[in-house]
Amino acid sequence: MDEELAFGQTVEVVDPDVRAHVYSLVTALGGFNGEDADKYVLGDDALACLRDIRRWLKLYDEKYNRMDVARCLGESNLVNGDLLPILSAWWHGNQGSRYMSRIALACKVELLVPLTWPLEVHAEMPANHLRHIPYLQHVQVLYKRGLLSRGHTPLLRAIIRIALPSMAVSRSERTTRDEGILKLMLYLLRNIAIISTNARLAAEGDEEETSRSATINAFQEQDAFALLLTMCSNVGDDFTMQDMVLLEIVFHLIKGVDVEKLFMSDAQRSAKRTDELSELLSKETSLRREYAKNAPTRHGRFGTMIWVKRDDAKMSTVSGQDVLKDSQATLYKMDQSKKWNKPKQRQKQELSVVNNDFDTPVHLNPIASKNLRMFVEEFLDSGFNPLFTHVRKAIEREADRVMDINSRQYFYAVAWFLEAERTRRVRQREKHSQSEKAAKEFEPDSFSLIASVLNQETFVFLNRSMQYSFDQKDWADLNAEMRCFTQILLTVQEMATSPLEEDQEIAENIQNRIFYEETTHDRILAIVRGYKDQGYGYLDACTELSHVFLRMLERYSKENTDMQIRSRRRAKRKKQLEQKGDENNGEEQDSEEEEMLEAERVSKERKFDFRRFSAKFCNQKCVDTFVSFARFYRELNSDQLKRLHRYFYRIAFKEEMSVLLFRVDIINLFYRMIKGPGGMDSTKPIFKEWEEFVRQLIRRMVKKIDQRPALITEMLFSKINSTMYYLEFGHEKQTISVTRRPPAELVVNPNDAETTEDKIKIVIGALVKDGKNRLVSWLSGVLDSAADEREAFEIQEAAEREENTRASRAPNPMIPVEPSDDDCKNEMFSNAKLRLLMALVKFERLGVEDIPGASWVVPAHLSSADIRDIKSTVDKCLADPFQGTFDREPQAMLQRKFQRENRGSFEPTQEVSFGNDSEGEDTPEFLFPPNPRSKSNALEELKKKRKKCKNDDGEKEPLDEQTIEERRRAREENARSRQAKIKSDLYVHASDEESDDEADEEFFRLEEKRRKEQSERIRQALLLGKVEELANKAGKKTQRKRPSDPQIAGDSESQNKRLRQDIPEDDDDLIMGGSEPDSPGLQTGDHDSDDDLRFEDDLAFRRNRESSAASDRNGPPGEAKEDEDTPVAASGRRRMRAGFVIDSDSE
């Protein structure tokens, strides 16, 4: 305001020139100044005046973002004084006049729609809008009252009549003008449905005339409902661009309406109102009773003020005679006077207050309820599927006509109509049960009337919208989406109990798809845990959703015990960024490399465990959400109180986590709900259940406090996961640590590479394809430094040899492989391709256990020249990475290593027969089971035979029957002779005639000899780091040797005896399986057993140790050939299970 403005001087809210121009146009439009005072007379140029008024609205208000013209038109009473009389005159006798039709169209289309457009208050509006909006909202209520009830003129029917010619034209022949007329007619109906009395403005007795009931009655009487039903049922065919406007009209007609009351009969509605009145009277009586306990007497109504001396010697003042009763009442009065000025966070300003308000209940009179129920039933029968299918598709493809608010309106309308359909079915069943018709005449309706919102597309759209709203913290949208999801679940639950088999199958399929996704479970849990201060409506929606979802999921999981869900977890991978800079400076590029972590979804199925899922709701945040809802217990109905009771009962007694409820404020709330003051109504049926629950909970709390007095201190605070389990059960939760397993060992496909250089090329190409160039560069640097170090040692040793020719040659020291950083150290354990490359460049791992952080070394037998050759190969492959062949990537040329030795060695022991020789099994026909071969060898032989047969099919002629029979007889004779040798060698051996004392003496003598030899080899490997190359070569061939070799069998027998002393009885299943952990030639880097820690040579080369031991036993490599008739099972092997010898029954 201007400072020079005199006191009492009026403020011009509108420019006087603008007001003068607008008033002159309204005056020139026409009036009631003719001979007949009840008849409106148009001015000489009324059509031009209407166009000028529209031009002022568009070029002044819209262009300058002001509301001056709209206010001037409201002050001049343009709508009720001019426009509505013009429409009335056209309806009563001038419908055939083209001039009057154009004027009527101008009144409706060009002026009524902008003047009745909803006004929304938001934070960014200018001061001019804030000055005019209260007045314009008041004027719009007057506009609505005039449109709904103007004498005997049905103005809504007149407005619809103006648009009928445009509707009669087919969609293909409809012009842009026709589409605009239809759209503006629907917008006018939408504006009428939205306009309501503002509670902050002074009312003038027109609340009933502009209420929701009056709107619904006018829509029914003037055929607006018939128009809406016609257009909704033909959406997509004749009307494609009007879907969003129709949705808004339907939304504003049904929002806030109680579905249960809507479908009640007159008798039920009257009984309901009687019950509500009785409940209000009982509340009033209880309040009076509470007041009467502490009310003053007739002669003691004087003011009272007392001082209360507290424990800390401070004084507090309390007023009122009710504090004189006792100390408890005084303290309670003090608590009521306390206020906690909690700092409030700035709330996000909603741009559309009118459209968000679907939580406020709306009361309808009986006539309006009947009219709206008729419209809803006809809409469900004809217009539900077309409208909501078309709206969903438009929202999904983000059409231009779609606004942000339409998604919220869509989900709320779907939820409301689904509840209406379920309520209608209940009323139909009740009506039929009360009728005199036979039950067999009643045919249940199918759920196909609402099938458009029960398909997979709707579920995907709903889940995506819920996740987006939750991430963006759009709580109003999430509220509507939660309501929709809840009603879908309840509808599916009713479909499952339908007598129609088709509905039951559809319900089963829908439940399977809803509960299959674990992301849905996690989202509902996150919504419940994420409640903060979103309001009562949001709190009601999220608690109802969690209650219904848990109940249905529990029932479904019990009916489907083998229920599977798809679990999605994040698997991190590193992706190298493209480097920019000088290409020649390779070292600088390597040092400046950056890595970006990306998360990709990895999906897998797993068995669903309902107890595990329900336990996720046992946390303090979920409990706080339901406690916040319980604080409204005075306003909650029986269903809501039952929902709270079921959750708290599940927490305290089903999940055995009652300690979560042991908090002072929660216990105080439960106590006040039962004992008061201001407790629950004891006449409600749910009161008894709550009373028993609170009694049992307090009893358990007292018992827990007696057991663990520390709980008294914990009652002041929320429980945390680290102490919650101990407070409940009295001991810490036992957890099992899971160690990381090494990745599966990879090899290069033999068909793709034969030489080591080709294998290195393929592995490096695969690493480069994965963006692991840094690891290859690090490996090249390790080889370079190792070559320099080895070369320096060789030069030093050569110089020492020249000085002292008799000096023995010192072995090369092992060179440790040091990772560059922690990521590289992790890759050395978890990256299977890098481990394969390290093995190809002759690196070796120290120790038996393959664990994170295991040491790798450059072995002693590699010379500096060998290391430089390997480095040159790696550098060449890194400079020009292998890109693969035409149809195969380098990664496809790698495969998992097939453990042939283990399977081939373990198989014979599983095929040993333990039958009694004296029972007739030693007949020629059943000498012994066929020669057991390893699975891997048999598979390879079978593949070779098949390939040979395929190659020779076209060359050789088919054999005759005589030749085939001769070959079969020869095979049988050969097999019989081989089985005889195996049986005699296995069951008859030299140890049968020996006594136990002699066997023990021989065993200990061999053990002492072997221990000395092993200690000497360990000492040489640790101190000198040298193992003969001959031992390596011999060891490799010996590892391929079958354990049927007599020397190996004899040696393994002694080791097996030692194993019997070390392996506990619990491992008898492992022994019977045929796996012997320490058998020579059978050990692998991946196996783990208790016997690996028996020796002190964990830091020695396991590979060299085995090869040297094998070379000592087997001699030269040339003697390692096996005869075809050599038995597979070791002749001297003794096997035990639980202390019993099971090699032979004769012993």
UniProtKB/Swiss-Prot annotation:
Residue ranges, compositional bias (Polar residues) = 907-916
In the record, what terms sit under GO molecular function?
A: DNA binding
Which residue intervals are annotated with compositional bias (Acidic residues) in the record? Answer: 584-597
Sequence ranges of Basic residues compositional bias: 566-575
Repeat found in the keyword field: no
Q: Which Pfam families match?
A: TIMELESS
Membership in a protein family: Belongs to the timeless family.
Q: How does it assemble?
A: Component of the fork protection complex (FPC) consisting of tof1 and csm3.
Q: What is this protein called?
A: Topoisomerase 1-associated factor 1
Organism, by scientific name, is Aspergillus terreus (strain NIH 2624 / FGSC A1156)
Its ancestry begins with: Eukaryota, Fungi, Dikarya, Ascomycota, Pezizomycotina
